[in-house]
């Protein structure tokens, strides 16, 4: 665990990093607002008109009904203000209408109100969401319990993420028949949400089996995949193939991906793997399409056929797959000085991948804008895309953005505080160059108080993460440490690797933000661009 005296870049940025959930499970992502549900009774006409896209007319029809206390109409007006459709966007007015609808026991209003309150930076408002959801859970434990589980796992209702309470609420929701909560439990025990100490492959398998038995086709494919390629202690080829067959019969074609993955990575039979990927590709399964493209591009078990591979990537890209767009962009932009046609074409594919929320693509697009290869450097666009990738948890983007803030570029002055925080966030994900950069700042006392003990620990960690140039810094700092400090530095390194929070010290200075736990890095890492 690293504690640094760097100010937060912004509440939004820190929140995005300090809650390392790999995928949203109930709470809406970003500002996403789904369409309201179908209404019955007096508000039906207003709701139908609104869902047809005539938002202003829907608001007009709902207003007099809302004044009479109609819960459906109140909910619709709340949604309109939250989304800015048909009226002004206003979180305050959305909350006002949702509260009134919630008082009339409107379930969706309770949940939308809770989403807004949970996103608040005020603890009091988040606690209001907790109370509303716990009350709703008495009648609707499935949905309310699922949302509460995620809120606790994200640390929105407690000072730190609380996996025990998350599991409690998900189990309660699951017992009420909520298949999504069953799947969340399966993923949780698989370690997808962090907390490796609570990982339990057998419990994960139990929950995947439960969801599959209840008819969830995605769970059928996931279960089959785990039985074929998961932890060796739980593998069962016969049962795995049976579940994948059921998934395919139910038109869940990701099962072909699981079969291909099993043949490729467990059985080491590349021809059999390609056959499964081809079947999935023919059924329209995008991931199988990408795997098949890889086989032809790399000549794995077949004669190398770049044209066929690229054609498959283009087909996947046309279907909107961001990874396919990114791979084509990489092909077109690979040259040091790509031709104009390739540059423009690559830019288009890269932009599509970035708009598809692929952090790697967002990072590369940001760098492309900053490079000036498009004719002139666009600092604003470059920083915007790097920031978006950084908010998505991309360690390379965090490091790149930190470097920009540390050095400063035209149109963007230096900001050591931002740089330090971003380096820390990237280092917490095991990023070697960021770890070294952070060690350098800490040693030199740039933006923070010089701390040779912490600097030695960080520099040593950077060496372990493949940064050979960190050796010189380790040696230099070591010459400044006395015996007592060397012992403290070793302890600091051990603490960083363990992920435990350091012991608190009496310090009259303003408390520094606590970054996520440092993860031990591999002995070697790939070179960073």
Where do the protein language model's features map onto the residues?
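Short helix-capping/linker turns of helical repeat alpha-solenoids
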Residues: 37, 67-70, 83-85, 104-107, ...
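Terminal, low-structured helical/coil segments at or just beyond the last alpha-helical repeat
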Residues: 27-33, 464-529
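Alpha-helical adaptor scaffolds
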Residues: 395-429
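Structural signature of tandem alpha-helical TPR/SEL1-like repeats
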Residues: 52-57, 88-97, 121-132, 159-169, ...
